[in-house]
């Protein structure tokens, strides 16, 4: 299970292709060689998201996020969804667009928790937990 909140858009869309925001120790310092040439980066997020198929992937992409464009996320999802479909699970890529800025609103956060629980087959009712397999 993967959950992303305000986490990505196409490198070409990110601040018009200026990758300076990525070039920090806490993110991807090695992107420095591409700072002014996003088109030269040998990957983009549609490929990374496609690689997650068939896992459950929940993406919160707010419509008023100043860092990451929601419509770019939709283009990425459109490009990645056929790979999910090849695995028989196009519905496993779920995109949400709350009307807010760079935030993870409570409704989407709770839905993401449910998505995680579904993916992990977790329940708060111990009588509904799947039986443990013996350790070998």
Question: What residue ranges belong to the model's regions?
Answer:
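Mobile cap/lid helix-loop segments that gate and shape the active-site cleft of serine hydrolases
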Residues: 1-48, 67-77, 85-89
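Alpha/beta-hydrolase-fold serine-hydrolase catalytic core, especially in secreted/extracellular enzymes
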Residues: 45-47, 53-136
């Amino acid at each position: 299970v993967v959950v992303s909140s305000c986490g990505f858009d196409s490198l070409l869309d990110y601040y018009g292709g200026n990758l300076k925001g990525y070039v920090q120790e806490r993110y991807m310092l090695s992107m420095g060689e591409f700072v002014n040439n996003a088109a030269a980066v040998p990957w983009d997020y549609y490929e990374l998201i496609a690689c997650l198929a068939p896992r459950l992937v929940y993406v919160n992409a707010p419509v008023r996020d100043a860092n990451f464009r929601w419509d770019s996320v939709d283009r990425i999802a459109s490009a990645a969804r056929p790979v999910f479909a090849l695995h028989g699970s196009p519905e496993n890529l779920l995109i949400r667009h709350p009307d807010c800025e760079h935030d993870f609103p409570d409704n989407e956060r709770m839905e993401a928790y449910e998505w995680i629980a579904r993916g992990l087959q977790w329940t708060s009712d111990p009588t509904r937990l799947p039986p443990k397999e013996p350790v070998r």
